[in-house]
């Protein structure tokens, strides 16, 4: 059975939660062994897959989890706004470190390596390709190029302002077009994740609300300060 078919079965049985284990950079939690521990806890709690940034983090996580890993490498480039898995060598390193799925930036923006070239390299390794997109046009273009999974990851992050709510309309549009959609980006409550599934999401990735302690504390502190002012 293919990995995609296995995931279809797991999602149907367990609800489709993917946990992104990406600590705040330079946080006390930003250590491969801690990332791996968070990933294992997420797997034991029912996550069907884990999203991991960085080769060292992925190597540590691969050693302890059995669920599929979505691997990415983030870089800050001087000549491109693209940050997620921008280079062939990133794909190769993630493949060697044990990724099952490799996610790349799938937006229509200047980049060092074309999307189709990165997708071909992922498939060369026999892995599934996911594209992190921001618009319906991005997602549909990537689907035509052969990406098996389309993420709404970058919706709201390629524009001057980022909305507070997740982009459910994008989930529905891509799902209606026949894409396997991973809803991602600002899914901070179980109710929002459930809404994404009702809008046609194949799965939902949750990051900050589960694995970024600093963000969660900030949400509580902000709300509590407002309550007493």
From Swiss-Prot:
Write down the chemical reaction(s) this protein catalyses.
an N-acyl-D-glucosamine 6-phosphate = an N-acyl-D-mannosamine 6-phosphate
The source's superkingdom equals Bacteria
Described purpose of this protein according to its UniProt entry: Converts N-acetylmannosamine-6-phosphate (ManNAc-6-P) to N-acetylglucosamine-6-phosphate (GlcNAc-6-P).
The record, for InterPro entries, names: Aldolase_TIM (IPR013785), NanE (IPR007260), RibuloseP-bd_barrel (IPR011060)
Q: Which cysteines are joined by disulfide bonds?
A: none
Official protein name in the record: Putative N-acetylmannosamine-6-phosphate 2-epimerase
One Gene Ontology cellular component term attached to this UniProt record is: cytosol
Query: What keywords appear on the UniProt entry?
Result: Carbohydrate metabolism, Isomerase
Q: What biological-process GO terms show up in the record?
A: carbohydrate metabolic process; N-acetylmannosamine catabolic process; N-acetylneuraminate catabolic process
What are the protein's GO molecular function terms?
N-acylglucosamine-6-phosphate 2-epimerase activity
Q: Which gene encodes it?
A: nanE
In the record, the note on similarity to other proteins reads: Belongs to the NanE family.
Q: Which Pfam families match?
A: NanE
Q: In which pathway does it act?
A: Amino-sugar metabolism; N-acetylneuraminate degradation; D-fructose 6-phosphate from N-acetylneuraminate: step 3/5
What is the taxonomic lineage of the source species?
Answer: Bacteria, Pseudomonadati, Pseudomonadota, Gammaproteobacteria, Enterobacterales
- Name the EC number(s): 5.1.3.9
Signal peptide annotation: none
Coiled coil ranges (UniProt) are none
């Amino acid at each position: 059975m293919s990995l995609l078919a296995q995931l279809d079965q797991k999602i149907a049985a367990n609800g489709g939660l993917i946990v992104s284990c990406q600590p705040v950079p330079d946080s006390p939690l930003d250590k491969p062994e801690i990332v791996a521990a968070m990933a294992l806890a997420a797997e034991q709690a029912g996550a069907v897959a884990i999203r991991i940034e960085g080769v060292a983090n992925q190597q540590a996580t691969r050693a302890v989890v059995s669920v599929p890993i979505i691997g990415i490498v983030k870089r800050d480039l001087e000549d491109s706004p693209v940050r997620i898995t921008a280079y062939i060598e990133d794909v190769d390193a993630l493949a060697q470190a044990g990724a099952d799925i490799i996610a790349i930036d799938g937006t229509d923006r200047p980049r060092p390596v074309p999307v189709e070239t990165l997708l071909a390299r992922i498939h060369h390794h026999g892995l599934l390709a996911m594209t992190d997109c921001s618009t319906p046009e991005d997602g549909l273009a990537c689907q035509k190029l052969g990406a098996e999974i389309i993420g709404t990851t970058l919706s709201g992050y390629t524009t001057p302002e980022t909305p507070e709510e997740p982009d459910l309309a994008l989930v529905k549009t891509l799902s209606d077009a026949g894409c396997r959609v991973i809803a991602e980006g600002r899914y901070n409550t179980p109710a929002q994740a459930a809404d994404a599934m009702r809008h046609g999401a194949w799965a939902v990735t949750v990051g900050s609300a589960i694995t970024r302690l600093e963000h969660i504390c900030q949400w509580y502190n902000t709300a509590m300060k407002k309550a007493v002012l």
